[in-house]
Every structure is written in structure tokens, then in C-alpha cells.
């Protein structure tokens, strides 16, 4: 419930394959029946007037892979992470690839990821998500040259095979980035269009070509082809073209079939037509049904989450609400809960538990910088992330306090050191708290404390065995909390005698159900 809406939800197990239903509204003084097109005070006999669910097709059921809701993701920007064990060179590099130059900026490699799997797993991650790793021109690897090989600045195909195998041996999953909305300037098909103009057999692979197609050196010159945003070096692909669809669907199959990856994160997914995504889903799921598909969608994403396109999306709304409440402290607990409730109620339950909940990524400012380097605010946000419904995603280095408001800063090289900083120890405790308590992954969510003009927020996560209660005191004043019949799992600033929380304190309780 919030200022504007009451929210209701029911899980119905029906023995009937056809269901007709209506809503009964009762405020204690008046009862109305709602049939969609009209209200009435009496029951309607004509079932054609009812809401109807004529048949539940398996293909229409949103069913993300079962492993997803238990996952804790560690998101790695490969160029920035590691060259070796607890080390990154910070040095730029250039490599030749089929006559083209690929570039690295900070020296990160796949070998560096392999040699730091102990660190990632000990932190509490059960899955790694790698930003683009295929051969591409620039350090970020979003300007693709070759979709079938690892960028030489990052290593070899065999390095990647070893990474996947090593992760699987540890019980960890691997998700990679799929960039199909656009390619690089020197991608073979676009290069053919530039060289052969209207005679190119790939001219229909791209949008809005004006011949002759040229690569403008001046960044202020608008190109004679459609591109990603205003990035002239990233021509936009025509994913409505069956040839383009089949090419990229085979890419999707290839990395699952040959390297056994566990998922695709799909770049700028909302800019690509649904027909392509449905074909891509079918291609990938035929190879490995448990391969997760996560779309990059910045807005509300119900459209893509009905079981026929994606299993999950990057939940930037989660970040936005956490920013307002924890980092900026610009909204109170009641408003935060209203926004979180609205976000939760948009999605079907299986999808809600598979949403990728991030505080930051390679595209946005570091959350620690939004907290103005205040570890207390950061810690409360992280604890909420690890105890909320959905898959928590940690961007590399967040646990080490990497700071950055601009792109050059928030893709900063990993700050390796021998000792874990205090923030990293907090991350480790919070991530392990989640993985050790199934109620935090699969349990129901219920708000128990969220008042106006107050920063105290409380909620419960409950499964068939355990109830976990969390209180976050996101304010500069101490706060009393309701008595809880349970034992403390973790606390900071909790005074049991007075049942109160210190400013910016928290308490996590557990009790058997």
C-alpha cells in the first residue's frame, strides 16, 4: 500500500484449464463487483463478461533458470580487472587481429580473471558476468570485429575455455555480453559495404545507407548510415533481416555449444526488434535450456519478461531507488517503500526473483561516489541489495571503494592490495549472508516498517523454514525498532536492552517458521 494504490497478489492453483474471474471490492460499507468494462453491485451470470484465462500455454509461462534466484553475480569489466593474481599492469596495449588493431587500456586479461577466482569466490560470488570479450577495436570491446574469437588483448579462446571450466569446477556460472545492436567500423560486413557500395551483398545488413558509404574521421560529421546513438564508429545492424538474425543466432549457439557458457547479457536490448530476440531465445535455449538471457533495459521491462523474450533484465530502477534513499537520503522510508513496492508489483514472481539488481555498472557513476565516500550509506545499500528479492550484482571494485563520477573514473583499474579493506569485509559478510540463507533468495518479501519523515526501514524475507527480519536505520538519529522473537544474525549499532538502532545502524534477525 502507498499513497496512491493498494496492491493485491494471489497465487492460484486451479484444477481447471479454463478460468473465468472477476474482482470483488469491499470497503466495509459497500460491495462492488468489477468485470473489467464495468462495475456492478450484483453478480453477472454471463461468463463472457468475466475476465478469462482460456488456457495456460507452457510457452507463455515466465520461467527463468532455477539456479538464477540463488546467484550472486560479480560483474567484471575485463580491461580494468586484473593482469595476474592480485595485480593489474595499468599499461595500454595494441594487438593485431586479421589486419586490424585491437586496443587495451589498463592491461586486464582473462588470465587475470582465472588467477583471481579464489578472491571472487571467497568474496561470496557464485557467478561472474563479463563485459564484452570478443575481438574489437577499443578497450571497452563494444565495437566488434569478430564474434567468434576472444580479443587478443584479453587472451585466447583457450584462456576463455579454461575460465569457464574452472568456474564450473567451483560450482560457479559464467555470463558473457552479447552486442548485436551494432558492430565496429571494420566488421567484415560493414567493411564490404564501404568497399563495394551498392554492389555489396551485405548492404541490407545495415540501416539508412547513403551511397557511397564512408567512415567519417571528423566526430562532428554525421555518418551516411545509422549508428548506435551518435557513435559513428558503431554502425547499427538491421536485425529485422533474416540473414542478420541467423548470423547472430549462430553466435548465440556457438558460445553455448563450444564453451558451455551459462548466460548472455544482451546489450541495448530495447533498441532491437522483438522478432530477433524471440529467434535468439529459441536458438540459445535449444542448446542449453538453463542458459539465462538478461536484457539491458533501463526502463520498466514487463514487455520483455513474459516468458518469450528474456528471463531477466538489468534492474536500473533498483539502483535509482537505492540512490535516492541511501546515497542521497532525499526520500524517506515511506516513499522508498512505495517505489520498491511499485517496482516489485510490475513483474511476475518468477521474473522478480531473477531480476539483476545492481547499484552500478560500467555505464553509470560508482555508487560509492554517490554516497560521497560515506561507508555507512554504502553499507546499508549493500545490505539491502543482498537481502532483497532478485539477483544481486556487484561491479568489480565496489567492494574496494572504487570512486568515480565520470566514465574515465568509474572504469578505474582494480585497486588490488594484500589486505581486504573494511568495505570489502562488509561485502563479504553480506554476500555470504545471502548465500547461506535460502529465505533471502527464494523467500517472500513483506514490509513491516516504513514511515514518513523517517529513515527507519524494516522488512521480512520468509520461506518454509526461516523468517529473516531486517531493519536499516538510514538517518542521523537513533530509532526504536519493534520487538522481534528471534536471534541476531548480524548487527551494527543495535542495542538489545532498549531495542534500538544507532544512526546508520542495522540489525538482521532470524527465527524458525
Residues covered by each model-derived region:
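Carbohydrate-interacting/catalytic domains
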Residues: 1-72, 77, 83, 89-91, ...
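Short, flexible loop/turn elements at secondary-structure junctions
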Residues: 12-16, 77-80, 134, 151, ...
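Substrate-binding/active-site clefts of carbohydrate-active enzymes
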Residues: 71, 77-126, 133-258, 280-286, ...
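Hydrophobic faces of well-ordered beta-strands that scaffold small-molecule active sites
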Residues: 72-74, 128-130, 174-176, 264, ...
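Conserved, mostly hydrophobic/aromatic
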Residues: 76, 120, 130, 147, ...
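Aromatic/acidic polysaccharide-binding cleft in carbohydrate-active enzymes
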Residues: 79, 306-308, 312, 353-360, ...
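Short glycine/proline- and charge-enriched loop/turn segments
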Residues: 141-150, 230-232, 316-321, 407-415, ...
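Active-site-proximal helices and loops of the catalytic beta/alpha 8
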Residues: 164-172, 182, 187, 191-198, ...
Amino acid at each position: 500500500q502507498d499513497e496512491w494504490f493498494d496492491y493485491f497478489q494471489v497465487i492460484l492453483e486451479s484444477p481447471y484449464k479454463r478460468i473465468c474471474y472477476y474482482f470483488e471490492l469491499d470497503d466495509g460499507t459497500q460491495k462492488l463487483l468489477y468485470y473489467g468494462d464495468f462495475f456492478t453491485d450484483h453478480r453477472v451470470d454471463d461468463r463472457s463478461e468475466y475476465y478469462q484465462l482460456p488456457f495456460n500455454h507452457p510457452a507463455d509461462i515466465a520461467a527463468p533458470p532455477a539456479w538464477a534466484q540463488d546467484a550472486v553475480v560479480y560483474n567484471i569489466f575485463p580491461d580494468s580487472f586484473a593482469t595476474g593474481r592480485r595485480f593489474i599492469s595499468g599499461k595500454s596495449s595494441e594487438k593485431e587481429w586479421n589486419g586490424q588493431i585491437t586496443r587495451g587500456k589498463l592491461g586486464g586479461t582473462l588470465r587475470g580473471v582465472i588467477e583471481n577466482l579464489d578472491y571472487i569466490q571467497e568474496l561470496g560470488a557464485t557467478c561472474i558476468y563479463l563485459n564484452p570479450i570478443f575481438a574489437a577495436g577499443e578497450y571497452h570491446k563494444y565495437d566488434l570485429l569478430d564474434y567468434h574469437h576472444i580479443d587478443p588483448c584479453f587472451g585466447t579462446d583457450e584462456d576463455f575455455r579454461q575460465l569457464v571450466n574452472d568456474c564450473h569446477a567451483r560450482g560457479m556460472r559464467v555470463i558473457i555480453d552479447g552486442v548485436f545492436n551494432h558492430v565496429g567500423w571494420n566488421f567484415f560486413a560493414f567493411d564490404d559495404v564501404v568497399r563495394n557500395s551498392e554492389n555489396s551483398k551485405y548492404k541490407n545488413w545495415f540501416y539508412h545507407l547513403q551511397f557511397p558509404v564512408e567512415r567519417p574521421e571528423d566526430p562532428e560529421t554525421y555518418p551516411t548510415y545509422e549508428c548506435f546513438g551518435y557513435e559513428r564508429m558503431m554502425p547499427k545492424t538491421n536485425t529485422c533481416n533474416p540473414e542478420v538474425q541467423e548470423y547472430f543466432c549462430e553466435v548465440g549457439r556457438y558460445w553455448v555449444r563450444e564453451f558451455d557458457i551459462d548466460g548472455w547479457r544482451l546489450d541495448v536490448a530495447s533498441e532491437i526488434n522483438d522478432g530477433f530476440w524471440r529467434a535468439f531465445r529459441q536458438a540459445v535455449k535449444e542448446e542449453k535450456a538453463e542458459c539465462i538471457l538478461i536484457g539491458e533495459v533501463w526502463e520498466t521491462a514487463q514487455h520483455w519478461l513474459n516468458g518469450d523474450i528474456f528471463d531477466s533484465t538489468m534492474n536500473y530502477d533498483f539502483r535509482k531507488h537505492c540512490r535516492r534513499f541511501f546515497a542521497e537520503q532525499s526520500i524517506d522510508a515511506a516513499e522508498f517503500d512505495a517505489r520498491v513496492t511499485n517496482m516489485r508489483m510490475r513483474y511476475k514472481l518468477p521474473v522478480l526473483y531473477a531480476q539483476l539488481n545492481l547499484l552500478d555498472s560500467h555505464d553509470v557513476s560508482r555508487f560509492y561516489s554517490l554516497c560521497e565516500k560515506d561507508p555507512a550509506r554504502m553499507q546499508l545499500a549493500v545490505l539491502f541489495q543482498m537481502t532483497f528479492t532478485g539477483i544481486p550484482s556487484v561491479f568489480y571494485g565496489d567492494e574496494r571503494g572504487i570512486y568515480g563520477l565520470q566514465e574515465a573514473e568509474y572504469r578505474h583499474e582494480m585497486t588490488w592490495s594484500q589486505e581486504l579493506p573494511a568495505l570489502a569485509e562488509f561485502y563479504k559478510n553480506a554476500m555470504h549472508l545471502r548465500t547461506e540463507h535460502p529465505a533471502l533468495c527464494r523467500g517472500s518479501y513483506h514490509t513491516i516498517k516504513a514511515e514518513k519523515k523517517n529513515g527507519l526501514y524494516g522488512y521480512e524475507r520468509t520461506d518454509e523454514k526461516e523468517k529473516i527480519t531486517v531493519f536499516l536505520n538510514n538517518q542521523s538519529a537513533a530509532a526504536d525498532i519493534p520487538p522481534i522473537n528471534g536471534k541476531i544474525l548480524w548487527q551494527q549499532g543495535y542495542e538489545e536492552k532498549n531495542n534500538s538502532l544507532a544512526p546508520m545502524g542495522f540489525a538482521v534477525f532470524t527465527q524458525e517458521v
